Amino acid sequence: MQRFEWKQRNHEPQDLGLIPMVIETSGRGERAYDIYSRLLRERVIFLVGPVTEASANLIVAQLLFLESENADKDIHFYINSPGGLVSAGMAVYDTMQFIKPDVSTLCIGQAASMGSLLLAAGAKGKRFCLPNSRVMIHQPLGGFQGQASDIEIHAREILYLKNRLNELLSKHTGQSMETIERDTDRDNFLGAEDSVKYGLVDAVLTSRGEGAG
């Protein structure tokens, strides 16, 4: 038997604010979980809000934990993010590719910037979005102040990251590098059906039975 309560949680890695608690009752008594921990038991993890070092570390830890629990069962990764730090996002991306279980991705709301790469990086055939979700791809943003030599170093790094991210988008979408470079030159928003056509996701889901966990 389960019931819900609401409690304020402080210092949440993804700054989720008020978190519902699930109270499970059994013959041994009651046990409380926050809703995200309860869903983690069902192999569901979330990226909510910006991609930061804290949120990325949390997601990496959950991916590794779920692999240790069952290396043959899919993990379901729900994304609602405006993007964020490239280095943090790449930590999540590399872990998704590293672990053995397939990671099925689902866009709810938006997957922009680094969020769009993580969406596209799910297991082939298991990348989804909901009908009214939005996906945005673009080139990485950066700014730096300092000595001219340091600015030059950071400019080279930004150009490297731009090329690397384009290579990864090309790999996961099947689009050519030339197409990716053109389409990411400015903010490029795509709806659900256009995201399927572009290769960012495999299908648009309108109900649970169509494929998502």
From Swiss-Prot:
Record bears the keyword Cell wall biogenesis/degradation: no
Keywords: Cytoplasm, Hydrolase, Protease, Serine protease
An example Gene Ontology molecular-function term: ATP-dependent peptidase activity
Record's catalysed reaction(s): Hydrolysis of proteins to small peptides in the presence of ATP and magnesium. alpha-casein is the usual test substrate. In the absence of ATP, only oligopeptides shorter than five residues are hydrolyzed (such as succinyl-Leu-Tyr-|-NHMec, and Leu-Tyr-Leu-|-Tyr-Trp, in which cleavage of the -Tyr-|-Leu- and -Tyr-|-Trp bonds also occurs)
Leader sequence residues: none
Localization in the cell: Cytoplasm
PROSITE patterns, sorted: CLP_PROTEASE_HIS (PS00382), CLP_PROTEASE_SER (PS00381)
Protein origin, superkingdom: Bacteria
One Gene Ontology term, aspect cellular component: endopeptidase Clp complex
Active-site residue numbers: S113, H138
UniProt EC number: 3.4.21.92
Family: Belongs to the peptidase S14 family.
Protein name in the entry: ATP-dependent Clp protease proteolytic subunit
Name of the coding gene: clpP
